[in-house]
Amino acid sequence: MEINSPMNEKVKNWAKLQQKKYRDQTGKFLVEGEHLIGEALKAGAVEQLLIEAGRTNPFEREKEAIVCGESVMRKLSANVSGAWLIAVCTQKTTAPAGLRTVVLEGVQDPGNVGTIIRTAVAFGFDHVLLSPDCADVYNEKCVRSTQGALFHIAISRTELIPALNELKELGVTVIGTALQGAQPLSELPVSENIAVVLGNEGQGIRPATLDICDQRALIEMSSFESLNVAVAAGICLYRYRRCG
């Protein structure tokens, strides 16, 4: 099968996935690049694989590709220069409750969200829980920032306070990052079943959410008042890492 017209109905529908509302409606999203698509294939998330005419499919054994003209690939790519390999992927429909959870409240930058997801996988967490006002996980910038980790961790989006209370009932210790009324992170006990809460880039964690945290963690620094949220996440998650 070969598609050469950007006006093809399939192409029009794929192009709509560049918009969040269509990603939400269909449960699908676009992924570009050989590395990310390789990770998606490992997770069984690739529905359709699109390749530019004249190119060799690096995943020929795993997935047959639909050959597309350059103009089609440019229309579907988020990059100005286009992409030669694009996958239409399915979003995860279930996210099992994890006892090692990273919780994001109001984190707006998709690059930060993606970097935190990547860090969570690296340090052995099994669930990322996002508030409804966080950046879209399936935004192209976020997907790229995860470097494929998106496909290897449970992800869910819901109201945080009920979800955190459920985790606490399961015996999970909930730790929120804070600047006031907090103990140094290095002095807090290490727990296996842990939920680390990180807040909005400018405002931090909302008071109501912070109130239900079991502990408040302060990252000790010399002079600066705060860190980028993705950097703060890396420090906190390393503290509670699970290796192997």
Language-model features, listed with the residues they occupy:
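Boundary-proximal intrinsically disordered activation/regulatory segments immediately upstream
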Residues: M1-R55, C134-A135
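Short acidic-hydrophobic, aromatic-tinged amphipathic segments that line or gate anion-handling sites
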Residues: E2-S5, I66-G69, I153-A163
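Amphipathic alpha-helical repeat scaffolds
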Residues: G33, Q108-I116, L227-A232
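Glycine/small-residue-rich loop that forms an oxyanion/phosphate-binding "nest" at active or ligand-binding sites
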Residues: A65-T90
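Short beta->alpha connector loops at strand-helix junctions that form conserved
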Residues: C68-G69, E105, S131-P132, A154, ...
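Structured adenosyl-cofactor binding patch, chiefly the S-adenosyl-L-methionine
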Residues: A87, A122, V137, C142-A149, ...
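RNA substrate-binding interface of SAM-dependent RNA methyltransferases
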Residues: T90-Q180
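Active-site/ligand-binding-proximal alpha/beta "capping" segment
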Residues: G176-F224
